[in-house]
UniProtKB/Swiss-Prot annotation:
<dbReference type="GO" id="GO:0048029">
    <property type="term" value="F:monosaccharide binding"/>
</dbReference>
<dbReference type="InterPro" id="IPR035482">
    <property type="entry name" value="SIS_PGI_2"/>
</dbReference>
<keyword id="KW-0324">Glycolysis</keyword>
<dbReference type="GO" id="GO:0097367">
    <property type="term" value="F:carbohydrate derivative binding"/>
</dbReference>
<keyword id="KW-0413">Isomerase</keyword>
<feature type="active site">
    <location>
        <position position="517"/>
    </location>
</feature>
<dbReference type="GO" id="GO:0051156">
    <property type="term" value="P:glucose 6-phosphate metabolic process"/>
</dbReference>
<dbReference type="InterPro" id="IPR046348">
    <property type="entry name" value="SIS_dom_sf"/>
</dbReference>
<dbReference type="GO" id="GO:0006096">
    <property type="term" value="P:glycolytic process"/>
</dbReference>
<dbReference type="InterPro" id="IPR018189">
    <property type="entry name" value="Phosphoglucose_isomerase_CS"/>
</dbReference>
<feature type="modified residue" description="N-acetylalanine">
    <location>
        <position position="2"/>
    </location>
</feature>
<keyword id="KW-0312">Gluconeogenesis</keyword>
<comment type="similarity">
    <text>Belongs to the GPI family.</text>
</comment>
<protein>
    <recommendedName>
        <fullName>Glucose-6-phosphate isomerase, cytosolic</fullName>
        <ecNumber>5.3.1.9</ecNumber>
    </recommendedName>
</protein>
<comment type="pathway">
    <text>Carbohydrate degradation; glycolysis; D-glyceraldehyde 3-phosphate and glycerone phosphate from D-glucose: step 2/4.</text>
</comment>
<dbReference type="InterPro" id="IPR035476">
    <property type="entry name" value="SIS_PGI_1"/>
</dbReference>
<dbReference type="Pfam" id="PF00342">
    <property type="entry name" value="PGI"/>
</dbReference>
Length: 560
């Protein structure tokens, strides 16, 4: 067992896998896929989900070695420590308990010796009551009109997760029916264009604004909040703010100072990281206002089902653990720096951007949890696009350029099926034909010999050859309901945690986002003094000075 100050790459389990890479270098996926027993062993089913990872560049013995790696990394203990509320976010001295946000009412999950589940449900019950008042029209705006439009202001984890879930549910029949006559929009960027787009076509009289900021000091969020407060007060007067703005925050003093009734503030806790907060009031409040709490509760139950699977299932059948170990294999041993997330569902168009943050903010680290520089890369560059759109965009590179492991996500039953008379298959079958074909195209490729048999001209054979041996996995969901969306979210959250646990890093802090904020403060002060007092640029390097000079000379901002 490695000591706390040793790097995990020095363990025998890690070194064993390093040697194993050399052993399998010449093994092609064509050969691996011909072994039916191996393929069968790489199918995992849970609660209607089917995972197929047989197209990973991993013989059976690779999986055995990866499970040994998990043991050497004390993965069982680390998962238990997370669920037990220990302060595994050591740099911020915090528990990591997003699992408590979707736990059943009778569950016991402790932080600092106290069961937090009752607190979670107090907030959920408050959200349920408030959202029902808004949706029923018993709570009205300053002019007596029902509030049918919601703008949620937040950034990063306060925006990407809720946006993903909202987009996924927009065409779900149950959610669609529940949202009739309502709109939900998300304002994140401080670019005034984002404000203009969000308020376009909306009437302040029928709009409710949800301001999401734990401290109520997040620069971008609070500037946007002040901007929409001005929009409301200009139309309805200052007293309207209390009727048209609510908060998700723990800083009740600043909430009240802003003009929002503290009774209309919904709490969350230090043990919830921003990118893991979609199951807290951050996501549950705006989503409940749009779809009703009963729909959102199903989303929470789906996530909880995966939490329980993750906590209790042996690793060889544990979907998030297997996915996490395979990601470590692809990144640290096979040297693949990226991952494509490819949902064959337009409803999941915002899934990849959310997981991009969850993954890259969590595992984009350069030191171990003990502060030692890492001699290996962690994390991967996550990107993606729904199929088949991505096929006409970046799949060319995936097939014949760099090797990029792919996650294919398919849905058995469409949210909005279409059957056209005279067509060979339904629209959804056409979509799914591509879902099933692409992983095989990546795995098998096409050889020069095959092309010769097809009488392809010699000069085109090099251009039409596909090397294959490009890894992917397939995740098949029975349908895309609120419950399934919750499952999908939790699978990826826990997968990311597994990667971090194995790499020996802290996946729950994000110091990398701080430096740019600090430097922006200096620029902000300079812009203010230059615009109001004509102060000369000072304290910047030549490059930044030149850019700032051009910006100040040519922009037409009014004097503050």
């Amino acid at each position: 067992m490695a000591s706390s100050t040793a790097l995990f790459c020095d363990t025998e389990a890690w070194k064993d896998l390093k040697g194993h890479v050399e052993d399998i270098k010449k093994t092609h996926l064509r050969d691996l896929m011909s072994d039916a027993n191996r393929c069968q062993s790489m199918m995992m089913e849970f609660d209607g989900l089917l995972l197929d990872y047989s197209r990973q560049r991993a013989p059976v013995e690779t999986m055995d070695k990866l499970l040994n790696l998990a043991k050497a990394a004390q993965l069982t203990e680390k998962i238990s420590r997370m669920f037990n509320g220990e302060h595994i976010n050591s740099t911020e001295n915090r528990s990591v308990l997003h699992v408590a946000l979707r736990a059943p009412k009778d569950a016991v999950i402790k932080a600092d010796g106290k069961n937090v589940v009752p607190e979670v449900w107090n907030v959920l019950d408050k959200i349920k009551e408030f959202s029902e008042k808004i949706r029923s029209g018993s709570w009205v705006g300053a002019t007596g009109k029902p509030l049918k439009d919601v703008i949620a202001i937040g950034i990063g984890g306060s925006f990407l997760g809720p946006l993903f879930v909202h987009t996924a549910l927009q065409t779900d029949p149950e959610a669609l029916e529940s949202a009739k006559g309502r709109q939900l929009r998300f304002l994140a960027n401080i670019d005034p264009v984002d404000v203009a787009r969000n308020i376009k076509g909306l009437n302040p009289e029928t709009t409710l604004v949800v301001v999401v900021s734990k401290t109520f000091t997040t620069a971008e969020t609070m500037l946007n909040a002040r901007t929409l407060r001005e929009w409301i007060t200009a139309a309805l007067g200052a007293s309207a703010v209390a009727k048209h703005m609510v908060a998700v925050s723990t800083n009740l003093a600043l909430v009240e100072k802003f003009g929002i009734d503290p009774n209309n503030a919904f709490a969350f806790w230090d043990w919830v990281g921003g990118r893991y907060s979609v199951c807290s009031a951050v996501g549950v409040l705006p989503l409940s206002l749009q779809y009703g709490f009963s729909v959102v509760e199903k989303f929470l139950k789906g996530a909880s089902s995966i939490d329980q699977h993750f906590q209790s299932t042996p690793f060889e059948k544990n979907i998030p653990v297997l996915l996490g170990l395979l990601s470590v294999w692809n990144v640290s041993f096979l040297g693949y720096p990226a991952r494509a997330i490819l949902p064959y569902s337009q409803a999941l168009e915002k899934f990849a951007p959310h997981i991009q943050q969850v993954s890259m903010e969590s595992n984009g680290k350069g030191v171990s949890i003990d502060g030692l520089p890492l001699p290996f890369e962690t994390g991967e560059v996550d990107f993606g696009e729904p199929g088949t759109n991505g096929q006409h965009s970046f799949y060319q590179l995936i097939h014949q350029g760099r090797v990029i492991p792919c996650d294919f996500i398919g849905i058995v039953k469409s949210q909005q099926p279409v059957y056209l008379k005279g067509e060979v298959v339904s629209n959804h079958d056409e979509l799914m034909s591509n879902f099933f074909a692409q992983p095989d195209a990546l795995a098998y490729g096409k050889t020069p010999e095959q092309l010769q048999k097809e009488n392809v001209s010699e000069n085109l054979i090099p251009h039409k050859t596909f090397s294959g041996n490009r890894p992917s996995l397939s995740l098949l969901l029975p349908e895309l309901t609120a419950y399934n969306v919750g499952q999908l979210l939790a699978i990826y959250e826990h997968r990311v945690a597994v990667q971090g646990f194995v790499w020996g890093i802290n996946s729950f802090d994000q110091w990398g986002v701080e430096l740019g904020k600090v430097l922006a403060t200096q620029v902000r002060k300079q812009l203010h003094s230059s615009r109001t007092q004509g102060t000369a640029l000072e304290g910047f390097n030549y490059s930044t000075t030149t850019l700032l000079k051009r910006y100040l000379e040519t922009s037409s901002e009014p004097q503050m």
